[in-house]
Swiss-Prot record:
The keyword rRNA-binding does not apply. The keyword Repeat does not apply. PANTHER family: ENGB-TYPE G DOMAIN-CONTAINING PROTEIN, MSS1/TRME-RELATED GTP-BINDING PROTEIN. Belongs to the TRAFAC class TrmE-Era-EngA-EngB-Septin-like GTPase superfamily. EngB GTPase family. GO terms for cellular component: cytosol. Residues 22-195 form the EngB-type G domain. Mg(2+) binds at residues 37, 59. InterPro entries: G_ENGB_dom, GTP-bd, GTP-bd_ribosome_bio_YsxC, P-loop_NTPase. GO terms for molecular function: GTP binding; metal ion binding. GO terms for biological process: division septum assembly. Necessary for normal cell division and for the maintenance of normal septation. Transmembrane segments: none annotated. This is Probable GTP-binding protein EngB.
Length: 195
C-alpha cells in the first residue's frame, strides 16, 4: 500500500470512544519498547506520527491512526513492563482484552517481537491469547538490522519455536532502519483486510 495520508484519530480507553465508520482495523501489540512506534512510522512513511519513547510503558491508551482513509492501525499499550502499578497493569489488561475480543472491525493483530532475543513469557501469552480467541495474527520480528544477515534464520527459528507459531501464521523479519520486510508486512496486512 502506498500511504499518502495518515493521522491520529483518537486515543481511546473505552469502547464508546472507538471511532465509528466501520473501517477495518489492524491492532499492533508487543512488549514495551519493542519498536511498535518505529514500525508504525516506517509503514506509513512518517518520522514521528507515532511517538517513539525511551520510556517503556508510554502508550497507555488505544491509539487509532487512520491510513489513506481506508484502514485504522490501533496501537495497543505495551505489555510486560514492570514499572507501573499492578492496578494500572490490570486496567490496561482489561482494556486490551475488551478491545481484542469484542471489536468487530478488528481484522488481525500484528504481534511485534524482537528478533535478537527469544520471545518472553508475555509474548507467548499474547500469542496464545490471540490463538485462543481465533484472532488472525502476523508476527513481525523487528530490529533485524541489529544482527548479521547470516544469523537471521537461526533467530527466526527461535522465535517460531518459542511462540509455537502455527503454519498458517506469517513470521516477517523487519527493520525500521533498512525498511526490510515493509512490503511483505503491507502485503500480509492487505490480505487480512481483504478477508
Amino acid at each position: 500500500m502506498k500511504v499518502t495520508k495518515s493521522e491520529i484519530v483518537i486515543s481511546a480507553v473505552k469502547p464508546e470512544q472507538y471511532p465509528e465508520g466501520g473501517l477495518p482495523e489492524i491492532a499492533l501489540a508487543g512488549r514495551s519498547n519493542v519498536g511498535k512506534s518505529s514500525f508504525i512510522n516506517t509503514m506509513i512513511n512518517r518520522k514521528n506520527l507515532a511517538r517513539t519513547s525511551s520510556k517503556p510503558g508510554k502508550t497507555q491508551t488505544l491509539n487509532f491512526y487512520i491510513i489513506n482513509d481506508v484502514l485504522h492501525f490501533v496501537d495497543v499499550p505495551g505489555y510486560g513492563f514492570a514499572k507501573v502499578s499492578k492496578t494500572e497493569r490490570e486496567a490496561w489488561g482489561r482494556m486490551i482484552e475488551t478491545y481484542l475480543t469484542s471489536r468487530e472491525e478488528l481484522k488481525a493483530v500484528v504481534q511485534i517481537v524482537d528478533l535478537r532475543h527469544a520471545p518472553s513469557q508475555d509474548d507467548v501469552m499474547m500469542y496464545d491469547f490471540l490463538k485462543h480467541y481465533e484472532i488472525p495474527v502476523i508476527v513481525i520480528a523487528t530490529k533485524a538490522d541489529k544482527i548479521p544477515k547470516g544469523k537471521w534464520e537461526k533467530h527466526a527459528k527461535v522465535v517460531k519455536e518459542t511462540l509455537n507459531i502455527e503454519k498458517e501464521d506469517r513470521l516477517i523479519l523487519f527493520s525500521s532502519e533498512t525498511k526490510k520486510g515493509k512490503q511483505e508486512a503491507w502485503s500480509a496486512i492487505e490480505q487480512m483486510i481483504a478477508r
